[in-house]
Amino acid sequence: MVKTFEMKLGGRPFVVEIGKVAELAQGSCMIKYGDTTVLVTACASKEPKEGLDFFPLSCDYEEKLYAVGKIPGGFIKRESRPSEKATLTARLIDRPIRPLFPKGYHNDVQVIATVLSMDQDCPPDISAMIGSSIALSVSNIPFMGPTASVSVGMIDGEYIVNPTSKQKEDSTLELIVSGTKNAIMMIEAGANELTEAQILDAIMFAHEEIKKIVAFIENIVSEVGKPKSEVIAKQMDSNLLTEVVIFLDTKLANAIKTFDKTERNENIQAVSAEALDYFEEKYEGRSKEVHDILSMLIKVETRKMITSEGIRPDNRKLDEIRPISTQVGILPRAHGTGLFNRGETQVLTITTLGDLRDAQRIDGIGEEDEKRYMHHYNFPPYSVGETRFMRGPSRREIGHGALVERALLPMIPSKEDFPYAIRLVSEVLTCNGSSSQASVCGSTLSLMDAGVPIKRMVAGIAMGLIKEDDQVVILSDIQGMEDALGDMDLKVAGTEEGITAMQMDIKIAGIDRGIMETALEQARIGRLHILNKMKESITSPRIELSSYAPKVTQIKVHPDKVREVIGAGGKVINKIIDETGCKITIENDGTIYVAAPDQESSRRAVEMIELIVKDPVVGEVYTGKVIKIMDFGAFVEILPGKEGLVHISNLAHERVTKVTDVLAEGDLIEVKLMEINPQGKIGLSRKALLPKPETKSETQSE
């Protein structure tokens, strides 16, 4: 039986249908938000996967082009690999729900959200995120939700729930928040230098809306929800645990307190290997149990060391930033480079400038758009001393690249001020935590080295959290071990003026306003420290671009002149391109961008365009080319694409019988523009520039 539920969300109807489609899935729902329709399903395997020490959750977000009435391009004519937007949305679905499955639950769980119809003003990503919570909550899958999600914008200081596409253009904030009725679970934000207080107020505003949606979902579950499956978690053998603890004594604690990462890992591995060998000999076939106990003890010991003793794995204070060093201009042929080192994390970011035709065209189910500023993040296996197959960017790499891109976006100059396409690539060379925020810092240095006039410098910092009962410890600039064993990963990027990007993921059941407020203030202090260290290498963008970068010149012509510049079938513009070697981009408003390999080519191309759009002026003298000879005169091209007639009577003072007696096609002659008639036809004279012959009376008087 079909059940329909409805509430208002952002002033628009939000409708949930249960039992209409996909009934063989353990949980499913059809979300209708305006004209946006999203089908979300949740399925789980009947049996857990043996030998796993992680929860095998997969979330997929499918964009179907029929949702916006499009047929896929290319030869195959069907949707292929997910777009970057689809990958990022899949991550948004995954992150808030992952912490809410029972510990020890290792069944395969798959959530699939399929966009069936798309309304630009009703975001399908939010519909998919809420739908995933509903599908899991009404199913028999042991999900400890529900969660809910909203998007928040800010216009003139006012917060807006799920802003429309038009409102997003005017908004200084793009925030997505997920949470339960009691706590925040996930944050993704881009902002135009907002203060910590403004961001925090926006998060709390979002949480109030989340509470309403959660209550709505709880009502749905009370009516159509299925009983949850029982999770029988494998219990740790307490006797074996005691034996391992006694065997280790203080060895594990001493190994963890080794400050160098490589040496610490080696010491921990040595202690673990010793314990595994001992207990394998004592209890044959129980190595897996001993390994699980060791992993648990490493986590417990590290967290206890931080919370009780105030000692971090590398002996830093809780709010201390690792040593920072920076360098710019290290690759001779690159347009800009920045090398950023923070502790054992090292990122090299390279800037490449191109003409506007190098901008990325975005063609999905959203509005068609172009992206002239791009950031790509690469995390090769050697950065952590490992091996793995390299088969294109992972979801994590795409997500980190998008975060760094968002952090710098408000500082990128407009197309009018800097008419270039900009691509940044961050190569993580060594990683011990906070590589995405090191990429933010490296990108700032690289852009400035390339001469991109960014408005202000941007830096990023990753914050961590260890929460044991009522004891809360917030860590600045977390390293890899603290990230893996901690309860929160909060990334904050911004300038001296405010926050430009933020991302938060947690592994516990949520955090409150007090923790968020403390973490943001601690992040602000750390960010300002990092910005000051970055200024030791470069303080402002370089005045001149690299000699290897294209030279882009912007000129403005009247829109009516665009046709003349292009010419019939592109004849005129192609001639300029062929003669100068430049790339030329023309926009409908009359803006022309000339990208040249060198300054001389740029000058020639601009000069040719200016001649084309220049209007002939009566009384001006021009050097023109004879392009056609007739019985009654000659046609002379005085400007590119503009020709006039020199009548036979205006060729010379004396009588001319045949035009060919004076001129030949291809001759260059000087002419004076005498008139432009109402039909736009141009009258020229050669005679007006020739000296008048002496008269008979003048000759006799001499």
From Swiss-Prot:
Keyword match Manganese: no
Localization per Swiss-Prot or TrEMBL: Cytoplasm
Domain KH: 550-609
Subcellular location, principal: cytoplasm
Binding site for Mg(2+): 483, 489
Co-factor requirement: Mg(2+)
Pfam families in UniProt: KH_1, PNPase, RNase_PH, RNase_PH_C, S1
Record GO terms (molecular function): 3'-5'-RNA exonuclease activity; magnesium ion binding; polyribonucleotide nucleotidyltransferase activity; RNA binding
EC number annotated for this UniProt entry: 2.7.7.8
Catalytic reaction annotation: RNA(n+1) + phosphate = RNA(n) + a ribonucleoside 5'-diphosphate
Domain S1 motif: 619-687
Gene Ontology CC: one annotated term: cytosol
Enzyme class of the recorded protein, top EC level: transferase
Swiss-Prot/TrEMBL keywords: Cytoplasm, Magnesium, Metal-binding, Nucleotidyltransferase, RNA-binding, Transferase
PROSITE patterns listed in its UniProt record: KH_TYPE_1, S1
Alphabetical GO biological process terms: mRNA catabolic process; RNA processing
Family to which this protein belongs: Belongs to the polyribonucleotide nucleotidyltransferase family.
Function: Involved in mRNA degradation. Catalyzes the phosphorolysis of single-stranded polyribonucleotides processively in the 3'- to 5'-direction.
Official protein name in the record: Polyribonucleotide nucleotidyltransferase 3
Organism: Alkaliphilus metalliredigens (strain QYMF)
Protein's gene: pnp3
